A protein has these predicted regions:
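A cross-family phosphate/adenosyl-ligand binding-site feature
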Residues: 1-180
Length: 180
């Protein structure tokens, strides 16, 4: 496979409902994006009754192979940036310790191995939070280990961890300027 002329955004969705709809809206605003949908994200799409109405140039990869075959594209320069968000505490923990057993954690690992910068929108970032569940807003209380893993992820090379939707928007804008 030859190196591509115009690298794309990669965006991995996990099984979190935290700002899920807003993340999908941001995906729709990007040019040339590939969406990696984990099995858990597919469940959340159904629970939140979300359709993937995205630009025609968007390619969708689902978590259907044991080896997460789509990750091979990272080796050939297909992606300039990976966005992982919303990222569950489970996904963040796996990223911190190097476990890559889902489509999301596999693309994160391959992005790191190929020095593709990653932006991670972590869900569990404060001791007390409000988040949207399928039937409305709920309070959640992330565990200390979840908060510690989010902090540890900030020390991973080529990774920017954002904790709010506003920070995600800023990180995306900054990356667009870097690529221009």
């Amino acid at each position: 496979m030859a190196k591509v002329k115009t690298p794309r955004w990669g965006w991995a969705l996990t099984g979190s409902g935290h700002f899920f709809k807003e993340c999908l809206a941001l995906v729709g605003e990007l040019d040339e994006v590939d969406l990696f949908v984990t099995r858990a994200a597919a469940e959340v799409l159904r629970m939140y009754k979300q359709d993937l109405r995205l630009p025609k140039s968007t390619r969708i990869f689902r978590d259907t192979t044991a080896s997460a075959a789509p990750v091979g594209a990272f080796y050939y320069g297909v992606y300039h940036t990976l966005v992982l968000g919303p990222a569950t505490s489970n996904t963040v923990a796996k990223c911190v310790v190097g476990i890559s057993d889902t489509l999301a954690t596999n693309v994160f690992a391959q992005a790191g191995k190929c020095r593709v910068p990653s932006i991670v929108f972590a869900c569990d970032t404060a001791p007390e939070m409000e988040t949207e569940a399928p039937k409305g807003m709920v309070k959640v209380y992330p565990r200390r280990i979840d908060l510690e893993n989010t902090a540890r992820l900030k020390d991973v090379d080529d990774v920017i961890v954002v904790e709010t939707l506003a920070q995600l928007g800023t990180a995306l804008s900054r990356r667009k300027r870097e690529l221009a």
